């Protein structure tokens, strides 16, 4: 993407404040135009002094002009600051809302730390561009457009020096940008690596402490930081060289203007005031050229950050739901999978032609070896992914034809990892239903057998649970997650290995709460502990993404198939029980 396109797209975000931004820009253009009068007035003062003319009127005019210019600049800058800060805040919340609403598959592919880093850096970069646009960018272009013809009207010979200076600035900037383009892109990649490493290490700090990896991870970060600097230093060297060359060019230009001006004054072709005024013009021009150089540098350094952000934004919009999707309402809970297939591009795992139907209120246990596709199946039901083949119907409606939001309104999920936010117990339970009353929230906690431990806490329901609930035990976290699901009161329930990480005593308490939660709900249970699936109306045995066995618990446990073998291996079913069952059936 060209620098112009990067900049133009950045400015489009200001569209929400068109009127206010336009007024600020116009005010800055007026100030830039008025500034041109300063060297002219100064030249007139010099002429008046050297010619012993009346100086006071011009001095008063110059002073008034300086006061007005200063006050106006402060007011305009204040408004520009407010606009830039306001737009940054709204962009952050808008982009956050779009990103967090994306399917989980998108987040798994993109990476949480990558999206976060891209968003935060882009917001700061855009803030700087917006601020400079309203303060300097356009006014600098206008000032240059006015300064050159005004200077030429005063003296073509001196103006030629300034034009050559402008060309020198342009050539230096172009050469340096071409030399550092790849280097700057490499710098941004290294920044992403550093941020990802820090984020990954901090989020897994308990593992690092457990395995004494603190020094190793710190050493790795230092290595990443050194690579960043190795990529950054050559870029900085080129821009330092550009700054030195620009300074040299402007110094030479001023010396040439002074020499030529002195010669013209001595020959009587110009007055001293004209030369002084022209030197003022030259200083203004050099200042504006420096601003243009800074502007070009700013855009150049922003390019990689903003291109990443634009790619992020575009991928979000590409994955947004079709406008025609409707809402699903009054769900009873009847579910049907019709030849559903799904695969991951970088893995052989997935689902292949899965078909089954569940009546409203039934409980389905999904079992099978690791990697069989159990979690993928329930993720497809919740539209974490969309099927690549076949259909999933809820009450006869294809779920790809309804919005994810309306579908998930009717599904409550209890994960193996409870997934608590670093907020109060009350806030975490209320995630189940927005606007739930205090009474409903407490009733859900009681139904989940969570009220007893909550009441022992000093702050009770206002107790903060810590990051990911680390101030609570595993059983306590899980009961809060169950309370959240009870409060949601959805007709479809998904239990994704909800008790596999609990001890036997805690599991018994949590299971009682889950049994209460399952009543009159269509329930999908993923469990490694096969003792939890005895009460299922249907058992699906998955292997390699296919349903290899399907039926009731008693039916499959006595069929001498894969499920029965798994029960025997886990000690739940003995060979003697299988023989007795076969004898009974034969009789």
Curated annotation (Swiss-Prot):
The name of this protein is: Beta-(1-->2)glucan export ATP-binding/permease protein NdvA
Family as reported in the entry's similarity comment: Belongs to the ABC transporter superfamily. Beta-(1-->2)glucan exporter (TC 3.A.1.108.1) family.
> What high-level taxonomic lineage is stated for the organism?
Bacteria, Pseudomonadati, Pseudomonadota, Alphaproteobacteria, Hyphomicrobiales
UniProt xrefs under NCBIfam families: chvA (TIGR01192), PRK13657.1 (NF010178)
Compartment(s) where it occurs, according to its Swiss-Prot or TrEMBL record: Cell inner membrane
Entries under Gene3D superfamilies matching the protein = ABC transporter type 1, transmembrane domain, P-loop containing nucleotide triphosphate hydrolases
What is the species listed in this Swiss-Prot or TrEMBL entry?
Rhizobium etli (strain ATCC 51251 / DSM 11541 / JCM 21823 / NBRC 15573 / CFN 42)
Q: Which residues cross the membrane?
A: 23-43, 57-77, 126-146, 158-178, 248-268, 272-292
Q: Which reaction does it catalyse?
A: [(1->2)-beta-D-glucosyl](n)(in) + ATP + H2O = [(1->2)-beta-D-glucosyl](n)(out) + ADP + phosphate + H(+)
Q: Which PANTHER family match?
A: ATP-BINDING CASSETTE SUB-FAMILY B MEMBER 10, MITOCHONDRIAL, ATP-DEPENDENT PERMEASE MDL1, MITOCHONDRIAL
Describe the location of the ABC transmembrane type-1 domain by residue ranges. 21-301
The residues the record assigns to binding ATP are 368-375
According to the UniProt entry, the note on domains is:
In NdvA the ATP-binding domain (NBD) and the transmembrane domain (TMD) are fused.
SUPFAM superfamilies under this entry?
Answer: ABC transporter transmembrane region, P-loop containing nucleoside triphosphate hydrolases
Q: Which GO terms describe its molecular function?
A: ABC-type beta-glucan transporter activity; ABC-type oligopeptide transporter activity; ATP binding; ATP hydrolysis activity
Q: How does it sit in the membrane?
A: Multi-pass membrane protein
Q: Which UniProt keywords apply?
A: ATP-binding, Cell inner membrane, Cell membrane, Membrane, Nucleotide-binding, Sugar transport, Translocase, Transmembrane, Transmembrane helix, Transport
What functional role does this protein have? Answer: Involved in beta-(1-->2)glucan export. Transmembrane domains (TMD) form a pore in the inner membrane and the ATP-binding domain (NBD) is responsible for energy generation.
The highest taxon in the source lineage is Bacteria
Q: How does it assemble?
A: Homodimer.
